[in-house]
Amino acid sequence: FGMWCIMCSPLLIGCDMNTIPDFSLKLLKNKELIALNQDVLGLQAHVVQHENESYVLVKDIEQKRGLTRAVALYNPSDQPCDFIVPFETLELGGEVKVRDLIKQEDLGKMKGEIRQTVQPHSVLICKVKAEKRLEPVCYEAEWAYLPCYDDLGKKSKPIVYVPDADCSGKMKISRLGGREENFA
């Protein structure tokens, strides 16, 4: 459910509400997760870190390029995963307040990185608020905002994909057009 919320997916319940377990019902009624899903920006999270079978996803909430973001530490594997996520990867700097949205509890203020263990087939969804926002150092094809995209080849310099081992999908987009609306 948390992954649906951070991805702004439609929230539908397809079960018998009379027999739903209390844990599941509590999760489906979690106001903080629902607020994340219904955030005014309506953005989907994108992958910023991928190691072995684990993923770190992030998105702006409340304000584009603001100090508050949502983060998912997603472990689809069969083993516990120890996450170490530098705040620079999340484009955040200074002291960062971290809140677990699933458990609805504050994890405190952190500096430098988030260190958490996530159990198999689980996710930790956090709201993070930083003292400052850092400039991104990597733009990836998976989440680039491309309103001027042209796949018909009619532009003089069409967008091209370029291999890049530092990108989670191992590819990035080049020649975005140099216009502000092309950047995430």
Task: Label every model-predicted segment.
Residues 1-38:
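Aromatic/acidic polysaccharide-binding cleft in carbohydrate-active enzymes
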Residues 17-20, 83-88, 110-115:
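Composition- and surface-driven signal marking solvent-exposed, interaction-prone regions
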Residues 37-45:
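Extracellular low-complexity, O-glycosylation-prone Ser/Thr/Pro/Gly-rich "stalks"
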Residues 4-7, 12-14, 50-92, 121:
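Carbohydrate-binding surface patches
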Residues 92-98, 112, 118, 122-184:
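Extracytoplasmic
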Residues 45-68, 137-153:
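Surface beta-strand/loop "capping" patches
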Residues 88-107:
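C-terminal accessory region downstream of the catalytic core in glycan-modifying enzymes
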